[in-house]
A protein has these predicted regions:
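Alpha-helix N-cap and loop-to-helix initiation/capping positions
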Residues: 55-58, 97, 135-138
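Active-site C-terminal subdomain of aminotransferase-like
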Residues: 1-84
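Short, amphipathic alpha-helical "lid/cap" segments that border enzyme active or binding sites
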Residues: 47, 137-144
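Glycine-rich beta-alpha junction loops
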Residues: 4-8, 42, 94, 119, ...
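Cytosolic Rossmann-like ligand/nucleotide-binding regulatory domains
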Residues: 115-116
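Short amphipathic alpha-helices in soluble, non-transmembrane regions
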Residues: 101-106, 142-148
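Conserved PLP-binding catalytic core of the aspartate aminotransferase-like
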Residues: 61-68, 75-109, 119-124, 131-133
């Protein structure tokens, strides 16, 4: 079972199973029976993305490396950074401090928005960095330098 959501920028899901399970699901899953099939353009897009995924290994490796580098730097600086993905939160704490830090990063050219209550619990305001494979090592180094300021 898997989905085609965020990971490949599409919609829908799939299941790989034996024929007997397929028949069972078709005949017993009312929610499945009464759903609408995906439009052909969605299926074509998903196929197009899936065909290209193997060639993107280098980009995935780079994204993992810069994500780990940023997480390590934030942790070393004393920030709580609970993340296992390329979305890296820098938990600052107080809303006011988070806003000031975000504004400082923005003035230096980084797209950094504060995330505050009620989106997150009181006292856990943060800046959430959504990294992409297009971000360079140099840019991450600049960000870390600013954070370490």
């Amino acid at each position: 079972v898997g989905t085609f959501g965020k990971a490949i920028a599409s919609a829908g899901a799939y299941i790989v199973c034996r024929q007997v399970i397929r028949e069972y699901l078709i005949n017993k899953m009312r929610t499945f029976i009464f759903t609408t099939a995906l439009p052909p353009i969605n299926i074509q897009w998903t196929s197009w993305v899936l065909e290209r995924l193997p060639a993107l290994q280098q980009k995935r490796t780079h994204l993992l490396q810069i994500s780990e580098k940023l997480k390590e730097a934030l942790t070393t600086k004393g920030y709580n950074c609970p993340s296992v993905s390329h979305i890296v939160p820098m938990i600052v704490g107080a809303s006011e401090d988070t806003i000031l830090k975000a504004e400082e990063l923005q003035r230096k050219g980084f797209y950094a928005l504060p995330v505050r209550p009620p989106t997150v619990p009181e006292g856990t305001s943060r800046i959430r960095f959504s990294l992409t494979a297009d971000i360079t090592e140099h840019e991450i180094d600049q960000l870390i330098k600013l954070i370490n300021g």
